[in-house]
Amino acid sequence: APPTMYRFFIKEDLSKYDLSSIEYATTAGEALNPEVFNQFKKATGLTIMEGFGQTETTLSIANFVGSTPKIGSMGKPSPLYDVVILDPDGNECKTGDTGEICIRVKDGKAPCGLFIGYYLDDEKTNEVWHDGFYHTGDQATMDEDGYLWYVGRIDDVIKSSGYRIGPFEIESVIMELPYVLECAITGVPDPVRG
């Protein structure tokens, strides 16, 4: 189910439903706040297995069945893809550093499931396909165990006093408050902080 559905689920009294036939709970499409994971597990006993993919990539990162998910992590790269996190200069990021999720392409051939370009739009295709990589436009960090943690879209980062702030990170902290059901963070220009 998409993350929006899980946010609706946790607002319901799930104890009045027979969920015994559900063996797995998966999600992708947008980041899911850890608080939603925790509330859903508390209500159902199920751990949501998060993943990441795009229309252009299919599922490229996931908490696959048989793996031990880390709550809030998208999981690990699919064996189909050589996923790396790159800094703005095209260098691989160190563990814990934020960078763009990219897929390395060998010999100029896209792996199975990865698109090869936008229909009749070479300019847009060239924006995402360059230097031997497909650039997703999404940012993440990779931890010491190889799990990826979603930060946000590159074009959705808020800059304040020279700091880069991911709205999802702030939303996740706010969602932990017991009296908050939903929240959204957006940037607003400030004359002093930018």
Regions found by a protein language model. Name each.
Residues 1, 10-70, 82:
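Gly/Ser/Thr-rich phosphate-binding loop
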Residues 2, 103, 111, 124, ...:
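AMP-binding/adenylate-forming catalytic core of the ANL superfamily
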Residues 29, 53, 75, 138, ...:
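Active-site glycine-centered loops adjacent to acidic/histidine catalytic or metal-binding residues
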Residues 61-65, 86-87, 103-104:
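Short beta-strand-to-turn element immediately C-terminal to the catalytic PLP-Schiff-base lysine
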Residues 77-80, 91-127, 165:
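Conserved ATP/PPi-binding loop(s) of AMP-dependent carboxylate-activating enzymes
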Residues 80-81, 131, 136-137, 181:
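Short loop/turn microsegments at loop-to-beta-strand junctions
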Residues 86-87, 95, 136, 142:
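Hydrophobic alpha-helical segments, especially N-terminal targeting/anchoring helices
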Residues 87-89, 98, 144-145, 179:
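Residue-level recognition of short loop/turn positions
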